[in-house]
Amino acid sequence: MARRTKEDAAATRNGLIDAAERVFCEKGVSRASLSDIASAAGATRGAIYWHFKDKVDLFNAMMDRVTLPLEEGCAQFSCLASGDPVARLRSVMAFVLGAVASNAQARRVFEIAMYKVEYVEEMAAIRDRHIAASGAFTAQLAKDFALAAEVSPLPVSLSPHEAAVALHALFDGLIQNWILCQGAFDLVKVGASATDAFLSGLGLKWGDGTV
């Protein structure tokens, strides 16, 4: 009986987070009320307060259930710790864009985090999470650009860090525009072509020596 009660409580909690995702996506975080979320979940405000301190706590629980795209990228760099650095850059970009395109829940939460919340006061922790992930991802990109430059020097005017910032901007722009345009283009296909065009523009080679 105790186990069933614990399972029921977990199911209720997850149902409330699911409902919060839908309501936050529809109304934005600031305009969404706990009553809206309770109604969407078929529950009461009391049920929300049983599991969460307030709306911010509920929002944080929603964010904790997913891995942000840049966090996915950092994890993938760790999985591909050796080998051709340019091929690794291509693989990481392709992996993360594919993960975004195929995971509806992560995509919805990322849309909320990008477009439907104000990062002020109690929401500052989420902004800090974005900044930390962004910095770590850029550092990983710069590391591989530096390794690649040892074989084929980058243009004099572009340092490994600057190349990393530029590729990071391309990555962010692709995801943000894809979400904003509601999947109007093939994120994986366009992302792969854009990544290859960017790397080729730097004169970098990968695999069989393709530029």
Describe the residue ranges of each PLM region.
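Short hydrophobic/aromatic patch on the recognition helix
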Residues: A41-F52
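Short coil/turn segments at alpha/beta junctions that flank glycine-rich nucleotide-binding fingerprints
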Residues: E26-S30, A81, N103, V151-S152
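Amphipathic alpha-helical segments enriched in hydrophobic/aromatic and basic residues
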Residues: F24, S33-L34, R45, K55, ...
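An amphipathic alpha-helix signature
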Residues: I17, N60, R90, A94, ...
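Hydrophobic alpha-helical connector segments
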Residues: A61, A75-R108, P160, A164-L167, ...
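Short secondary-structure transition hinges
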Residues: A94-A142, P153
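Basic, helix-initiating cap at the start of DNA-binding domains
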Residues: M1-K27, R31-A43, D57-N60
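Hydrophobic/aromatic-rich alpha-helical bundle segments in the mid-to-C-terminal region
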Residues: R4, A106-E111, A124-A132, A149-A197, ...
